Amino acid sequence: MSGVRQFNECPRALRMTPKKPVPIDSKPAWRIIERTMNKSAKLAELRHSLARYGLPPERTPLATGHPQADAVLGGGLRPGSLHEIFAQGWSGGGFAVLLALLAASRKSFFWIRPDYEAMEYGAVSPHGLLELGGDPRQMILVRTRNAVDALAAANDVLACPHVGALLLEMEGMPKCLDLVASRRLAFAAGESGVTVFLLRNGAAAQPSAALTRWQVRSAPSLPGDDDWGKPVFDARLTRHRLGGLGDFLMQWNPEDGCFTDVSKSEANTSAVVRAPARRPAVEKIAI
């Protein structure tokens, strides 16, 4: 019985014992090291979580050739990321396909567009792509019935890491293209390393996981003698998750395959480029 009584009274005595503060210096060293390791693990987990929500991994920036734009972008566009391009007409398509050519380099790139986009903004011309300095054999055009099919096709393309770039064209504000869908696109782009350009025709800006957002419209070309002039775009960077914003006048140079500053360009330059090897020359074809 005494053993039972002692067992019952022992916890009461312990509860009544006043607690004394333990000095910080008296904590074992192994416990301090354990806390430091736990903090490092939590920071690593947080960085991984941020990457999954659209912040791309570190990759070499893709220089556009425009000095002011590249300076604001931190060296250029970030590969393996989602970039949005908003426009109210055909000028957005021209700017987007030039960025896709730039990002794809010598690889193939996909252009996915619903059927009604071709009826509204015109069909894709291989001759026009040739005059812009690209090779029509690089482009793989995918036409879908609606925006849902276009989004599904884009996710399938992003499963292949050997694609140079992806241009996804959308009209208006379809319900399927919400914040969750943009996060999936951004995550797939980061995993595969494929740069995605989301062309939004006639749409208003809405929350998305895009790294950059551009508002684009056409600008007058420099005067020429008897040619069309090189394409010039008034491109406004309205969102940049890793840096600043800016408004740029960007001219596409087909010979060099990059953008240049209009103020530094020579006047009366020709828009007809040298034809690639083993391909016929094309002269003065409207794009």
Where are these regions (language model features)?
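Detector for small/aliphatic-rich hydrophobic stretches
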Residues: 3-111, 115, 122, 131-137, ...
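Helical mechanochemical/support elements of P-loop NTPase systems and associated helical scaffolds
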Residues: 65, 94, 121, 150, ...
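Conserved RecA-like P-loop NTPase ATPase core
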Residues: 69, 85, 139, 166, ...
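Short, solvent-exposed amphipathic alpha-helical segments in soluble enzyme
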Residues: 100-102, 126-128, 183-184, 252
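Conserved inter-motif catalytic segment of the P-loop NTP-binding fold
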Residues: 108-164, 169
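Arginine/glycine-rich "motif VI" loop of SF2 helicases in the C-terminal RecA-like domain
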Residues: 133-134, 187-194, 228, 242
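P-loop NTPase motor core
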Residues: 142-152, 156-220
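Phosphate-binding/switch region of NTP-binding enzymes
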Residues: 198-280
